[in-house]
Amino acid sequence: MNIFQINMQKCLLFALSFPKLWGQTLCIWCASLTFGGFLRRKRMADVYKGNLTTGSITGTMLRFAFPLMLGNLLQQCYNVADTLIVGRVLGADALAAVGSSYALIVFVTSIFIGLCMGCSAVFSMQYGARDLDGLRRSIFSSALIVGGVTLVLNVASLLWLTPVIRLLHTPPEVEPLARSYLFIVFLGMVPVCVYNFYAFLLRAVGNSVVPLCFLLVSVVLNIGLDLLFMLGLHMGVEGAALATVAAQTVAALGLYLYTRRRFPHLRLRKADCVVDLPSIRRLSSYSLLTCVQQSVMNFGILLVQGLVNSFGTAVMAAFAAAVKIDSFAYMPVQDFGNAFSTFIAQNFGAGRTDRIRRGIRSAVWLTTAFALLVSALVFVGAPWLMSLFVSPSEAEIIAIGVEYLHIEGSFYVGIGYLFLLYGFYRAVALPSMSVVLTVVSLGTRVLLAYLLASLPQVGYTGIWWSVPIGWALADIVGVWYYRSKPNFFR
């Protein structure tokens, strides 16, 4: 970690602990100025050349993966900032409202993120083959697909908000808070789409640093606005939602303008802006299947959230905090799986099968090391991690969350392998297999969760155990399919 990152962490931690609002705002402002100076000194377009088809395999994947990991960490900070401050400032009901909203937000955003991810696989192949004309045509076609779906999704989520909240068995005392929070967040879905579209585009051509930098600016702004809106202006959960939307808008606008200026080879020309049906069909076959994978995954999580809600506010609050910790914990292997997918896709486009074989071996060893290390840290530190989100006086909530983390945290290697399998099949033009693995994993999780939770002697603990069992079954299916195909780079 360099001196810039250390100073940024110190500024943010100090801001959150400062007793006065003016002091918190001053610290956030200083952190922003520090990062502004960093941006001026860095020529970010030159930090990473983007070619993953040459050089050391392990080093190349790690250099590309690290900014993804840090970027996902910052992405999680959007919601964690809300959760942390809401839980401490507004109380358990507000925490339950924001936490139960998280699953629905992730489900909706996963649809257009899945579209962007699927298009990104095509971008990587074209970039690996050095087909820049085809890449620009694909950018325009994918913008039509992603933009259209996002607008429809935005309208639908606002129209059906109340019925969906009730379908999730949200307790009556929490429902008004959840509705207010979700309404504002869904109004701000378009900036989230714009940011992710350009972030996946730049990652496809091997630049994972630029999206990270704009996310960092956004997170600093998000935390500052959280403090201002909730502590200073007493806006409640509406303030938390407004802070997140405003920060995401800044990230989206900044990344769009920066990409246009600093990546001229990606800028669309008049000849590129045509309705290319073959390109649309190809992108649709990738993006829609990846979208199905992401939406199935998060729909399963949404069903589980509804089951969790039926156990009351204490379990809801514990689950809300523990899921945040969980998402941070397996983030390294998730983002390494995405980096691995881009690595495979570029080399697949370039015809480098020898490099793909060696990359698979390196990825398995690295994922195993990541997962085992994080599992040990989460298992040992579970009580302390829960106390970051929940007041120490809430002993029942902390105990429930610790039980969740002890069960999930013991099996992170299973989801690490699953992320590698998702990325591999997406990169070699088999996104349908990623959908199959998702159905196996989430189907097992949902069915077992409802079955085990219905047993009085098991209760909500059965929900926690259903997750690693689903990971294991999907891993077995994915490896079996790989071993059954002799042409899969062995």
Walk through the language-model features, giving the residues of each.
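Short runs within selected transmembrane alpha-helices of multi-pass transporters and secretion channels
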Residues: 116, 184-203, 211-219, 240-255, ...
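Helix-terminus/linker motif at the lipid-water interface of multi-pass membrane proteins
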Residues: 73, 77-96, 165-172, 228-235, ...
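Hydrophobic/aromatic residues within transmembrane alpha-helices of membrane transport systems
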Residues: 70, 82-86, 98, 123, ...
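Short alpha-helical transmembrane segments in multi-pass integral membrane proteins
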Residues: 4-7, 20-65, 123-190, 232-288, ...
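Small-residue hotspots at the loop-to-helix junctions and early N-terminal turns
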Residues: 92, 96-103, 182, 241, ...
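Hydrophobic transmembrane alpha-helices of multi-pass small-molecule transporters
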Residues: 107-110, 222-226, 252-256, 328-331, ...
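Small-residue-rich hydrophobic transmembrane alpha-helices
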Residues: 95-155, 192-211, 318-382, 415-437
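Transmembrane helical elements of multi-pass membrane transporters/channels
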Residues: 63-82, 184, 195, 218, ...
